[in-house]
Amino acid sequence: MKIQYIIGILIAFLFASCSHEEEEQKPAYGKIDVAVSVTLPQPESVNTLTRAGGPYTDTDIKNADLLIFDKDAKFMERVKVDNDRLVVTGTGINFTVRLDATSERRIIHLVANGRSADGTSDRLNFGGITPGMAENAAISSLQTASLEHVDEGESTLLKHVMPLVMWGRFALNGINIVTKAEGVKLLRSTACIQV
């Protein structure tokens, strides 16, 4: 009799546990590391003396900013990468950045040297980009400070233009723990020749 009673209770628990609809479990998302590998534009050899003895070369990267857009090309966030997180390689830089995990596509604009060399102030007007802003409008709104307001003088102009601002765009079809962005190519957005 005890065995039938125990079997009956077990069957009742079994039916009770199966009768509840399974709740849809959403994956737990948060910030995860994404490795980014950047290929720098190679300088062309020119038979003039440009920035001789200057503190920067045409390929120096002192900091980077990632502008993250969603699958609908709407701005989401800006992620800063400081100099101490950049690893220089023979042809570029590598760094790891923390981004929100997602199964959806992300469009990423990488702006190198968009801040001062020490990373304390913006050289581009990133503050004009607001969440939800369309990619085309956001990117076309970025500008450097006008040279009209820069004092005359070689060192001041050099500080204003160097290191060169460089730009790259890439897309990730989802972000998870194995996501890598390799071979991101940068273009110089300015040129500077000092005579």
What are the roles of these predicted feature ranges?
Residues P27, K31-Q194:
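Short, low-hydrophobicity acidic/polar segments
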Residues S19-Q25:
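Bacterial lipoprotein signal-peptidase II cleavage site
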Residues I6-L10:
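Sec-dependent N-terminal signal peptides
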Residues M1-Y5:
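Positively charged n-region of N-terminal signal peptides that target proteins for export
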Residues L14-S17:
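C-terminal motif of bacterial Sec signal peptides marking the signal peptidase cleavage site
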